[in-house]
Amino acid sequence: MQNLFIKRLSGLLGAWLFPFVALYAQVDTTTYHQLSGVEVLGKVRPSTTRESTPLQVMDKAGMERLGVQDLSEAVKRFSGVTVQDYGGIGGLKTVSVRSLGAKHTAVSYDGVTVTDAQSGQVDISRFSLDNVDMISLSIGQADDIFQTARMYASAGALSIKTAAPLFKEKSYNAYVKLKGGSFGLFNPVVRYEQRIGNRWSASLHADWLSAKGDYPFTLINGKEVTEETRKNSDVQSLRLEGNVYGHFGQGGKLNGKVYYYDSERGLPGSVILYNSNARERVWDNNFFTQLHYENEWFDRLKFQANAKYNYSFSKYRDISNKYSGGKQEDLNTQNEYYGSAGILYTPCSYVSFSLNTDIARNTLVNNFVNAPTPKRWTSLTAFAIQYKSPVLTATASLLSTYITDKVENGDRPADKKRLSPAVSISWRPFQEQSFRIRASYKDIFRVPTFTDLYYLRMGNVNLKPEKATQYNIGFTWNDEISPFIRLLSVSVDGYYNKVSDKIVAIPNMYIWKMMNMGEVEIKGIDVNLSANIPLYKAFSLLLLSSYSYQDAIDVTDPEEKNYKNQIPYTPRHSGSVSASLENPWVNVTYTLVAAGDRYALPQNIEANQIDSYIEHSLSVNRSFALKKCTFKVQGDILNLTDKTYDIIQYYPMPGRSWRFSLSITY
């Protein structure tokens, strides 16, 4: 199965790479000067080839070209990423970078991190793409040294940037979108933008999603094959977002945001033979407000400050005779107060220094008897220095972390203190070629979450932080190969990660206990290629592909049966290929997303194996203007081959489905 998968994926990648190899001998180095302008424009859209650490970017135009309408769909196109998807339209979706786990991946929303001190991971399904201008994924320490200290405190970061209002002939913009699809999907979206005087503007965004999620799937039990229907997979969610933008010239700029999310969804659970009963439900309610202020003095000194308040409530309920009283209900309330300030000093054109400091207070209240009710103070300070010239970029940073917890009941953990360094370099050895060599190192850790420390009977206040060391070396190259290929971009990175004191759940007599028992070694390669090929007049073809190889093995104990086995839910081979044909009539995009065999449990035996899959999708769209309105019609067919597969074992993904959307911009 694995060999067949590799052959198929290699054939698909090779089929469109062959013309590039044949044309490489026709490289005209004199065209380089045209591309230097592309790198300058990278200040708006970060240049992925100039970075000293791996960076992948997808802007609004790229998402529309690929027909992407969901954040997790976009992230799956990035190399080195595993999206844990529990199936269904409303299923939990988290992001893991290079097998380090979702708790090592930060998620930022307009420059301010989104956090969950209880679980340590962020569900990206709660964010909409309809008001997003760009997403980016950085691995290691990004070259942008003027960011919050929290962004230094993770192994990788998924950054979501929403669209700011852009006014042309009138002082307002309006946007309406209706999306429907299989399994009862209905998703209306409304956005309104208003200019207020010369210095202010505002936007309002509303997004409601409803779906039954009752999709069919094939259940195989030995020789018995049955057709089943997923139950209790419905979702209802509402997103509201308001933004205010102020531009004061020499007085700087101020952005404010208010965000509200409310959802109710069923948890279909794993598929159990001869038992389709599922009554688990979860309610989520999240509100946050954040402010960002930025100013520049004397063209050499920049200042920024952020403030955020976050409220999060969740209710879990399961109805079953196994509980006393016939049901189990868990209530959790989190509050966060967060502040950040930073300065960037540029004494000369090539050298910059930054100092960023954050402070946060997190609390958790739940309905458990004698609950610890923890309160956590976190202080982060990051100092960075960067040298950046057309030939060389070198960045070094040092992060200082101090964390202390207080509890109302039970024992509290020891305070956590640590210094975390990072170094990266990018070098362009040939003046006439846009070819760069890069290398980076980062030492980082994650503190145990509230669940790790305090969860009923499983928590362990003696846990140490989980440490991760990252090494990366690679190269990037982009240029025009010939008149037939407008732009070819390539990045190849090899990496080695080491995780120690990994926090895992270990069976202990009659219960499971969180322990520092794991050690993991991760070796891998990430490859990204893109090409823009003009065909004829208004016809063009955009090709994108990514490939990842990850050898992530458990090296904890040579005596254990899973020693040097691949860690759970990490495919050795994964990748994606997209081909977009743009023309004056209908734009067509074909996408393939693939992952090799994985294992659901630490032992790599057949009973734990999850088969590889290849998902094919097709998207068509057409935009046209009518009077003062711009219309866009899009249709998508997902999982063209109607193949049943799991990303998480026993959580089947939907088969063939369709989506249709109509948007109007005025």
Model-derived features: positions:
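Extracytoplasmic beta-strand/coil segments of soluble accessory domains associated
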Residues: 72, 76-113
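Gram-negative outer-membrane beta-barrel transporters
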Residues: 349, 391, 489-498, 516-600, ...
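Flexible loop and strand-edge segments within Gram-negative outer membrane beta-barrel domains
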Residues: 211-217, 227-239, 245-303, 309-336, ...
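Membrane-embedded beta-barrel scaffold of Gram-negative outer-membrane proteins
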Residues: 302-318, 437-440, 466-523, 528-530
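Short, acidic, small-residue-rich periplasmic hinge/interaction motif at the N-terminus
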Residues: 26-64, 72, 139
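C-terminal beta-signal and adjacent terminal beta-strands/loops
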Residues: 495, 543, 594-601, 609-611, ...
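Structural signature of Gram-negative outer-membrane beta-barrels, strongest in the C-terminal barrel
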Residues: 346-497
